[in-house]
């Protein structure tokens, strides 16, 4: 018989060395804040874009019901909300998140978002109301809407493929480590230059 102490074997699920709980991946709080705000605004823009398309265009299909409201204005307002978050997320991605941009599943959503915002800024909201569906900016905006949907799906697939549910859940974590509080964000950006 061996006199070595018996250590409990770690369970296969959620535990690390010596049976202690395994900590999942940690994402910087600034990334989580910018990513979360941008993601919510993108989702709102994408869904309202679907409603606007169904009401005013519908060449390739319509929603089965017409929702009341001025959806062009709602869509445009959400785009205005999205703009500063998208710019800040792009700045973050090009500085602190530069290494992550090497993965196409991370860079393509930003490019699609840039096309969506840029083409949206070129549009006149009265075009759709008056049936003017021939403008290049509108066609680019439709293409961007499709690309955003595909790019976000590819981004989610890439996250799940790379780190599974723990990585996806780490983006929803609301706790911040010491040195990663909102008061530390400016210092983090300066240090990374």
Where would I find each of the regions flagged by the language model?
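Membrane-embedded alpha-helical bundles that constitute the cytochrome b-like, heme-associated redox core
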Residues: 1-193
């Amino acid at each position: 018989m061996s006199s070595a102490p018996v250590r409990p074997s770690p369970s296969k699920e959620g535990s690390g060395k010596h049976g202690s709980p395994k900590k999942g991946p940690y994402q910087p709080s600034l990334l989580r804040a910018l990513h979360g705000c941008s993601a919510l605004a993108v989702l709102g823009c994408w869904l309202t874009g679907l409603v606007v398309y169904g009401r005013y265009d519908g060449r390739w299909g319509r929603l089965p019901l017409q929702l009341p409201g001025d959806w062009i204005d709602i869509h445009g307002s959400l785009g205005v909300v999205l703009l500063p978050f998208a710019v800040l997320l792009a700045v973050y991605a090009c500085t602190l998140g530069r290494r992550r941009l090497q993965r196409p599943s991370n860079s393509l959503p930003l490019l699609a978002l840039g096309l969506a915002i840029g083409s949206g800024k070129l549009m006149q909201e009265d075009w759709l109301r008056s049936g003017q569906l021939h403008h290049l900016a509108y066609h680019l905006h439709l293409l961007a809407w499709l690309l955003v949907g595909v790019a976000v799906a590819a981004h989610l697939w890439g996250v799940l493929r790379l780190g599974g549910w723990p990585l996806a859940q780490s983006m929803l974590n609301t706790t911040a480590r010491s040195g990663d509080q909102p008061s530390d964000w400016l210092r983090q950006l300066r240090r990374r230059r």
